[in-house]
Each structure stands twice: as structure tokens, then as C-alpha cells.
Amino acid sequence: KQIPSLKHFSLYSERDTDKYNELIVPLVYRMTNLEELNLHLVVYCEKRFIGGYDLTRNIISRLLQLNKFVFNIRSRLPLNDQAYLSSNEDSQRSFNGFKNNKIISCVDYFPDRKEGQCHIYSYPYPAKYYEYITNNFPDGLFKYVREVSLYDERPFEHEFFIKIAKSFPFMEKLTVYNNKPQMNKFDERSKDDNRHLSAIQYPYLRLLDLFDAHDDYAEQFLLEFKTCLPIKLNLHVHFSTLSRVTHNFTRNATRMNCAKIIDSGVSGGNSSTSKQLLKDYVSDAKIIFSNSVE
């Protein structure tokens, strides 16, 4: 049944769906007089990513009254020995017919997970979250985004975090998913090597989740010459990671940033001695220990 009276429609979903063609596209077809459409989706695809050709065929050509189309679609694709994998250039080229919008696309492939990802969105980006950013992140200013997650099977280097801080100046929550060690490491003893580094500022950051990150990323955020953390930070991290990065809670170069932690969710470190070492090092923080497997 058609819905001709509907002029504006928005659909936001952070959960994956594999029913894009079966449910979402037919739903939009019913809105024959739609003038404004907002789609924010994560779609699991079987054969190909969602791109400009798909949106033109299934959305734009069907909605003749449409004058504003805002979208943020991240599609996922299993890697099954496909003969051809589309590139970011292919994805961007599919939007050549979008005359009234600046469209950004970012295509990535993850061999370990055997999965591909294509993130397409109209810019300026209106959402409050930006998920699974990779090293291919194309820059830009995202002043509405408050929650960010990073994922890649290649390491994130210091320069990448500079880019993230500049692109998301009002970021409040950051989650890092990356088990690959950094290639370009710097030590507080190597002062000559560190001269070109600038301590990255995250003035609005309130929650930093490093549960699924290599130790190097805890070091990236806790070393004072790499990062200047804000006060009242909530840190989620494994006890073993924190112990190694702080040299068993004796390292001076991590002491300043650790002093800014007000809440910390820590997995492991169940002995009374371990707990006391951490509490002495992060003296002002409320620490919640869990028995999660590290």
C-alpha cells in the first residue's frame, strides 16, 4: 500500500541488516511523493557493495519529488574468492551523476576477517557516530560526531591519530580495534627522534576503550609526548596492557596522563598486590576490576 501523503522520512539503524532489498527498498517505493529522505544503515551484502548506481536505480529514479537525500551507508561483503574486487575509485565513480551532493566513499578489504567494507555518505556528515574508520579514512571535518571507532588489519601510526583528532574535534568516545603493533615507535629516551612529534589533543574525550587493541595503542594514548589526555577520562583496558605500558606502574612518561583518569574498567589483575600497584599509580581514579579473559 502506497503512502502518498508522506513528505519526509528518516531511517536510522546501527544494527546490521541483510534485508535491504527485501524490506528497505520496497518500503521506500511506497512513499511516492517523498521530498526528503535520510538513510543511515549498516547492510550485509552477498555479491556487491551498495553504491551510486544502486541508489540511483532503487531510490532516486523512483522518487520523482525527492529534492534532498542524506545517507550514511556502510555495506559489508564476504570475501569468497571473487574474480574482481571493486576499488574505491569504482565506488566514487558510481556517484558521478549525483550533481547536488558531495559524496564520500571509502572501500577496504580485510583478509584476516575475509570481509570487505564500503562506507558511502553524503557530506556534510550529519550523524553523531562514525564507525570502523580505517587507514584509508579520507579526512574531512565532522563537527557533529561524538562517538568514533577505529578498525584495521594494518597498524595505526601517530600521524593517523593526528588526522582523527583534527577531523573529530568534539569526539567524546573513542574505541580502538586493532591487534597489529605500530611500525614507527618512539621512546621517551629518544629525544632527537621525538622532536617532530606533537602531543595530540582530545579536549572533549570522556571514554577511551582499548580492550581490543594492541599494547602499542595504550602507549600511544598514555605517553605524554604523544598525547595530552583531558582530565576526567574513563579508560577501559586490560590490566596486563596497563602494567606493561607503565613498566609495572613505575614509568614517569605515562604518569601524567594516568593521573587524569577518573574511572577505569580493568580486566584481569586480580591479586591484591596488583590492585594496590594500580591504585597507587592512578590514585584519583575509581577502578572497577573484572575477571574477563585477556
Show where each model-derived region lies:
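Eukaryote-biased activation of long, low-complexity terminal tails and linkers
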Residues: K1-E294
